[in-house]
């Protein structure tokens, strides 16, 4: 803990339960729910609520475990924007689509909400699926794989999915897919050290309109700024790079962040609790067990349009284990809350608090 920084990371709770490494955490966008996935082939869900009326302290409770039926590691988990559907990506090459029985908008995400049921299994990848994600409209789902492809699926009524494109732009394993927060722009990151950006041509198909090069090793993770004007990427080269949209289809590298001694496996860009002038808070984590929290701010300088200030840092977040995932809570009242998943099988919830 760095006392010379303005904030610290306070551990809210440990959430044990996975029998093997925990790979990813995902907050439900509409309900007080958190999901995690693991090498134990399961997805666990947790609800949270204030400990007392008006209190900032939260109580997390295990709601249920989805025995996904995947035959190998569940590597990725993602919520649809409605909060009612969950997608899982597995090393068995398949993508599972899950819905909860008898779910209603009035329930409080407790045990009475019904069991999760696999409504669709999407097949097509030849080998390990590494990442899944829904577009902001909820009408598209992307998946990527060690088979070097990115698939885009159209979400249709009654849990029907149609493949809209198989994108074969990367020359190596594709590690991550991330949708723009408001537009139908998809980004992917790869073992080939590049980031690809895709859009749909109404007269043609989905295509790659830009390749962002600059990382010197595997690109592990991507996260868009909340307003979508910037894209952050993290890499095996121990850097985070931030890219700015300078034209409709043109992105330019503007800032590099350092602060890790090993691969940066996961990043998450949230709105934060700062002033309206800043672009939010960027959390980074990885193989060195550190979590760094950066405040990103736009400047008036043409040559250096962004500045970054380290707000908080913690080492050994999961003891001696790698940290595989970090994610900010999307609910504005909890914009200072983040979750992590580690090789120790634990999910942890943290809050950024001023010293």
Regions flagged by a language model, labelled:
Residues 2-19, 58-63, 114-117, 308-311:
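A short helix->beta-strand "capping" segment at the edge of beta-propeller domains
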Residues 15-22, 66-74, 115, 122-129, ...:
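WD40/WD-repeat beta-propeller blade N-cap
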Residues 25-31, 77-83, 133-139, 178-184, ...:
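Loop/turn segments within WD40 beta-propeller blades
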Residues 37-40, 88-92, 137, 143-147, ...:
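Conserved strand-to-loop turn within each blade of WD40 beta-propeller repeats
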Residues 37-59, 102-103:
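Beta-propeller domains
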Residues 43-48, 95-100, 150-154, 177, ...:
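WD40-repeat beta-propellers
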Residues 327-355:
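Blade-level signature of beta-propeller repeat domains, shared across WD40, Kelch, NHL, RCC1
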């Amino acid at each position: 803990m760095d006392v010379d920084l303005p904030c610290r990371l306070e551990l809210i709770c440990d959430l044990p339960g996975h029998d093997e490494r925990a790979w990813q955490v995902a907050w439900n966008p509409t309900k007080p729910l958190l999901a995690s996935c693991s090498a134990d082939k399961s997805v666990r869900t947790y609800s949270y609520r204030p400990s007392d009326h008006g209190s900032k302290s939260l109580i997390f409770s295990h709601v249920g475990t989805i025995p996904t039926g995947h035959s190998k590691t569940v590597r990725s988990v993602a919520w649809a924007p409605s909060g009612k559907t969950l997608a899982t990506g597995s090393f068995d090459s398949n993508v599972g689509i899950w819905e909860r029985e008898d779910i209603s908008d009035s329930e409080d995400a407790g045990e009475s909400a019904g069991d999760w049921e696999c409504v669709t299994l999407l097949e097509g990848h030849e080998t390990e699926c590494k990442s899944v994600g829904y577009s902001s409209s909820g009408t598209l789902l992307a998946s990527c794989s060690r088979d070097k492809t990115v698939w885009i699926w159209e979400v249709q009524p009654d849990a029907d999915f149609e493949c809209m494109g198989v994108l074969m732009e990367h020359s190596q394993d594709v590690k991550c897919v991330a949708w723009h927060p408001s537009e139908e722009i998809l980004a992917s990151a790869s073992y080939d050290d590049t980031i690809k950006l895709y859009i749909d041509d109404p007269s043609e198909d989905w295509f790659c309109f830009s390749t962002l090069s600059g990382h010197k090793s595997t690109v592990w993770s991507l996260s868009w700024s909340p307003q979508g004007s910037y894209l952050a990427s993290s890499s095996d080269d121990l850097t985070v790079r931030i890219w700015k949209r300078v034209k409709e289809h043109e992105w330019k590298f503007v800032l590099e962040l350092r602060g890790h001694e090993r691969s940066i496996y996961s990043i998450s860009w949230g709105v934060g609790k700062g002033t309206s002038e800043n672009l939010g808070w960027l959390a980074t984590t990885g193989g060195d067990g550190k979590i760094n929290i950066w405040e990103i701010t736009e400047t008036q300088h043409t040559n250096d349009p962004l500045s970054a200030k380290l707000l908080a840092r913690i080492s050994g977040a999961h003891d001696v284990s790698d940290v595989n995932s970090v994610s900010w809570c999307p609910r504005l009242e909890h914009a200072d809350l983040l979750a992590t998943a580690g090789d120790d099988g634990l999910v942890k919830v943290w809050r950024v608090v001023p010293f």
